[in-house]
């Protein structure tokens, strides 16, 4: 049963500054996400924007379901690309514990087209 949804759209050019500022990049993305995005060649900005949008989408989807304050950073929400091309969440720390305690299933899709990246999350139990 669907419990909640979340959606986020972001302008890809917002991530130009991330490529020049490693600290900024590492504040929002795990090392694995950075390495995966770098392998995209010319699509590195789209990849980063899509991952960021996915993280924001998950927060939006979870916010109506959570009535307690939890401590998290966007690096606790990791976006993993699987060999077949699909993507999944790899959660860490308190947010992982919360999802497991609530017995939630997460579904994610990301799309990007030149100027924009969008992500959509479905939360089910």
Swiss-Prot record:
One of its GO terms (cellular component) is cytoplasm. Its cofactor is Mg(2+). Its main location: cytoplasm. Signal peptide: none annotated. It catalyses: apo-[ACP] + CoA = holo-[ACP] + adenosine 3',5'-bisphosphate + H(+). GO terms for biological process: fatty acid biosynthetic process. It comes from the Bacteria. Pfam families: ACPS. Keywords: Cytoplasm, Fatty acid biosynthesis, Fatty acid metabolism, Lipid biosynthesis, Lipid metabolism, Magnesium, Metal-binding, Transferase. Its EC number is 2.7.8.7. InterPro entries: 4-PPantetheinyl_Trfase_dom (IPR008278), 4-PPantetheinyl_Trfase_dom_sf (IPR037143), ACPS (IPR002582), Ppantetheine-prot_Trfase_dom (IPR004568). It is an enzyme of class 2 (transferase). GO terms for molecular function: holo-[acyl-carrier-protein] synthase activity; magnesium ion binding. Belongs to the P-Pant transferase superfamily. AcpS family. Transfers the 4'-phosphopantetheine moiety from coenzyme A to a Ser of acyl-carrier-protein. This is Holo-[acyl-carrier-protein] synthase. It comes from Borrelia turicatae (strain 91E135).
